[in-house]
Every structure is written in structure tokens, then in C-alpha cells.
Design a protein with these regions (language model features):
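Small/aliphatic-rich secondary-structure junction motif
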Residues: 3-53, 76-85
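Glycine-rich, Arg-bearing micro-motifs that act as flexible, cationic patches
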Residues: 109-135
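Short, flexible loop segments at boundaries between secondary-structure elements
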Residues: 138-144
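Structural beta-alpha unit
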Residues: 75-110
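A short acidic, glycine-rich active-site loop
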Residues: 54-68
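Short, well-ordered secondary-structure micro-motifs
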Residues: 18, 45-48, 96-99, 122-124
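Short, hinge-like loop/turn segments at secondary-structure boundaries
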Residues: 51-54, 102-105, 128-129
Length: 144
């Protein structure tokens, strides 16, 4: 039924649990996984020189965070014996990166947490999960 599952993660505790559950789902269905993390780009500043130095530091920090998230996910997949690719994107609208990556990678479904780092604010402002559910043409499994 499913051959390739996209598993987005933001590194939050629930998201890590969703990665574990998504990898188990892949193992049970014989699917391979692609784990995606999406970081937010650096907010622009009118102070060009200051922004350049801060921008580089911000990018380095975001890359480190993304690499750590993906290493955790890859380790979970490796322990389960599931083939897993990893991707990191930077986007102001993470849901778009999730939907586009699922399409580009020719995934059959998306397996993701019900909410992430934004917590209550995410619920009030509209969660990325809700946006993925609205915009994806693929089945979306929501882990709670």
C-alpha cells in the first residue's frame, strides 16, 4: 500500500515520538522513509553589517539544530532497519516545504505530529499540521 512515507519533524518531544511511530509504521508496511525538518529563515534587519554577522550565526545555529534533529531520526530508522533519507529546508511556511517535498520525493503519505514547538500559539494561529491537511493531496497520518 505505502512505499514511501514523508515524516516531518521540528525536534519537539511530540515530533520525536511521531518520528518513532512513523518509522514503526514504515517497518510494518515495508515502506521507506524520508525525514524532513524545516527551519525558519533569518528575519531581515535594516542594519546591514549587523545583520550579516547575525545572519551567518543564525544560519549556523539553524543548520546545527536541523542536523541534530535529522541525526536522531536517522538513528531511529537505522535501529528499526528502515531505509531513511533526510532533508533540511528553510522556509517561512513550513507546511509548503512539507507538501512540496512529499510531491518531489514521490511519497505516498505524510506521517506527522499533531502539533510542534508552537504549542498553544500554534493552535490559535493555525498549526502547520492543519495547513498540511488542508493543502496536501496525499493521505496524512496525524500522530497525537
Amino acid at each position: 500500500m505505502f512505499k514511501h512515507i514523508l515524516i516531518p519533524t521540528d525536534g519537539s518531544p511530540l515530533s520525536i515520538e511521531a518520528v518513532k511511530a512513523g518509522i514503526r509504521f514504515c517497518k510494518e508496511t515495508g515502506a521507506r522513509a524520508t525525514v524532513l525538518t524545516v527551519t525558519l529563515p533569518f528575519p531581515n534587519s535594516p542594519l546591514a553589517e549587523y545583520a550579516a554577522a547575525t545572519h551567518a550565526m543564525y544560519d549556523a545555529g539553524m543548520k546545527k539544530a536541523a542536523d541534530e534533529r535529522l541525526a536522531v531520526a536517522a538513528g531511529i530508522a537505522r535501529e528499526a532497519g528502515v531505509t531513511c533519507a533526510t532533508r533540511a529546508h528553510s522556509d517561512w511556511q513550513p507546511f509548503l516545504s512539507i507538501v512540496q517535498t512529499a510531491d518531489e520525493e514521490k511519497c505516498d503519505a505524510i506521517f506527522m505530529a499533531s502539533h510542534g514547538r508552537r504549542g498553544i500559539a500554534g493552535l490559535l494561529l493555525g498549526s502547520e499540521t492543519q495547513k498540511v491537511l488542508t493543502h496536501s493531496k496525499l493521505p496524512v497520518v496525524v500522530y497525537r
